[in-house]
């Protein structure tokens, strides 16, 4: 009996000590990401980044220093509770990049391009051992390229072009075996160019670099601008002299010709840079692999997407459009995706052209743009993979319950406007959407507007000339000049955005405007008439009841009518549209447009339908336009 009690005590003691040991281990592991005050290290690091930046649009507003978990913050993506992506491109951020970024040791992607960030690139970035993509291009960074970047052994994609970096290119970059894309162009770099293992290596626009790649050759030589691909081994210099003068002359003439060719090629690249804004260097030697990376894109295996969507089951069909059907899918790691199965793939160009266009689309990264996650191509299929937007599209939400409140509709309008502004004026190369409508504006988990389907029109039309003649769009949203001539421009998108604003205000689809018994005429006629008669309450979505600001509705209607003027030259640019939605410059624009319409009417003879009256959208020409749209049928 006594012996049994002793054994029981021993067992209890052993159990207690074991439990205590594992409890201590648990506390140790759970506190690995916490400071001694119980604060998440990643929160501290991100707040450090926020405090060193100036954020004019408040995109980092929900970065809260009292939070325990940063995974719900804007611009942040997490996996297994750790921050793996920091993406805030084209947000007008200024200030400096804090060294605390080095404490985000699980980061895989950093996208801060197209901002106004100054100062040095922090050396602490070299602590990010899991980093694969780093894009700091088109900022105002100064100082030298940190040699510590070479410590990030997994880095595959590095862009620091279009800054004001100085000094030499670190020779340690030559040791980065995973690096496939390196763009150092348009800085103030000097000295020799080290041999790089990157398949695509751009150093164009650095006037003080040396073309031969050795320090010795930099002394006493005139530096030359250059843009090169450094995959082949450098030619070994010959130790022996020429045998006779004839060989020397031939060699000299040949060398001169080669130099002239190099200079001509450099001038051609410079000219393309000036006219196209970007020269894409693209390599697709591994296109036959089942899975690979293309810049920031992942190439999926077709069977993987087939499995994720249950063989593209109709149960997973979440959308249909002019470019193809969209299916909801679930990958093996639990990620929810949206797979767009493109139509008309035989009308486009070849595989290389298709993937080049995809690369260009993937470079368009903005808070209000749907990020392209990956793609899949076979001999008969082309599929695009996107993150899944759980709240659907604006078109579907306008018909759903609970009703979208007025504040959310305003935020959607501004977000969609900023996305289009980026495509038109900040993206490189610029992109015309060509099918702006409520169904192509998606909503994320926080009901922020995300513009989708951008770039797809060009993706399927790249065999045609730069002036597209095939009209791609949706009836009711197509600008008159695009419908009649097939020529699209940024102003084509502005017209579609104006219709989108009216859809947000009324809760109706474009072709539903003005179809009620007491609303004869088409959308713009109906809206203008009620606006002139100060009867805007008849325009507003009945589901909103009286829960809206009348002045704000009137202002948004005015912006919509300015966007939908008949002549493209009279429509504002998207940068002007965004400013007007933010409350700046609307009064002046509206008065100028009204005066122009009044002038047009004063020059028209009575009972004569003049061209000036016909083509001013503040006159009664809209019904003709919509009739033409309806007759054109779906495309």
UniProtKB/Swiss-Prot annotation:
Membrane side Extracellular: residue ranges: 33-248
Cytoplasmic side: 270-635
Signal peptide: 1-32
GO MF, one example: protein serine kinase activity
Entry EC no(s): 2.7.11.1
Catalyses which reaction(s): L-seryl-[protein] + ATP = O-phospho-L-seryl-[protein] + ADP + H(+); L-threonyl-[protein] + ATP = O-phospho-L-threonyl-[protein] + ADP + H(+)
Keywords: ATP-binding, Cell membrane, Glycoprotein, Host-virus interaction, Kinase, Leucine-rich repeat, Membrane, Nucleotide-binding, Phosphoprotein, Plant defense, Receptor, Repeat, Serine/threonine-protein kinase, Signal, Transferase, Transmembrane, Transmembrane helix
Membrane topology recorded in Swiss-Prot or TrEMBL: Single-pass type I membrane protein
Function: Involved in defense response to geminivirus infection. Phosphorylates RPL10A in vitro.
Protein name: Protein NSP-INTERACTING KINASE 2
Organism, as annotated: Arabidopsis thaliana
